[in-house]
Amino acid sequence: MLDPRLLYSFSPALWETMRGTRPVLLHLWDGYIDAGLVSQALAEHLLSTCRHELLVEFDHDQLHDYRGRRPRMIFDTDHFVSATQFSLRLLKMWDATGKVFLLLTGREPDLQWERASTAITELIQRLDVRLVVSAYGIPMGVPHSRPTMITYHATRSDLLPRPNPMWIGRMEVPGGFGSFLELNLGKAGIDALSVGANVPHYLAESRFYQAVLAALESITTVTGLTLPAGGLYEAETANNAEIAAEVADSTEVQQVVSMLESQYDQQADGDLPSADEIGAELERFLHDESSKQEYRGPASATSADDVDRTDPGGADHPDAGGDADPGEPDTGDEPPGPESGR
């Protein structure tokens, strides 16, 4: 494997300000499994409501499969004017009280998963991150007219909030990079937890703000961060009104929703559909996702011009012996660990 540190550049001055903060890191991907576009909407919401600065930028050109996921291009009259830009960025964020946290967001890597996962894990270790949290939408046989159920999974069972319904047994599913990262974080002894917002399967391809808001509230609960809801309540109200109007136009859809409402109400004691039913729903959703090549653009972040384009292997890299090194000077083959918070 090539050196993971050559996958990114960073801001040395901003890196220094992270000493002693022991932040939470949120990773919200525009990726493989995200029913209701929960993760994407959360990332856009946080970037629009929280102060942020670009700390690390990954070289996504090494991670993206352009033929497998082709960029959208704009042609005007007689020339091309633009193409989708892919990015993966780690930003320093401030919540409503001024508390520092980190946000890793962008398109999930197509290539070099081991190398990218190792790079992110090493950054997490050097930044002395105390907890890694993700959120995404899970396609389920639930109605939009009932409260969004949240289920959790984590690298350690004692990280899981209670109650946490047992929503699935054991099954094999195609992996997304977020899940792959969580697995490797657990192997490295890093605490990581994911928030799964249950999204009606018939809304999996469109934004479902009720689930977005439920996921945000769950994140604030498990992290202690004060994250503003901003306009999410208004977006939820408008979104639900649009869904209700569409349902009212179709007798067939009304019957499906009514059936799901009955099932939901019968399961109010916490029991959920069987693993086979959930597995079938997930497999159907994942099959649909696999057949797509159209790219959904990631939430925009701070301009790349704000980053010090330091040579990742140069003297200013966190693992080199220069003044910007967040750990001790490297005296051997093993890169230094973080000092902050210790």
Pin down the residues of each PLM region:
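N-terminal short beta-loop-beta anion/metal-coordinating cradle
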Residues: 1-106
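Acidic, glycine-rich active-site loops and adjacent beta-strand->loop/helix elements
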Residues: 30-32, 62-63, 107-110, 137-139, ...
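Conserved active-site and cofactor/substrate-binding residues in soluble primary-metabolism enzymes
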Residues: 37-41, 111, 115, 172, ...
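Hydrophobic/aromatic beta-strand patches that form the interior of the parallel beta-sheet core
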Residues: 56, 102-104, 133, 191-196
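Flexible, D/E/H-enriched segments
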Residues: 57-84, 192-212, 319, 327-332
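Internal, conserved structured core segments that host functional sites
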Residues: 99, 107-159, 181
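Catalytic cores of processing enzymes, dominated by hydrolases/peptidases
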Residues: 141-222, 226
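A conserved C-terminal secondary-structure "cap"
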Residues: 203-342
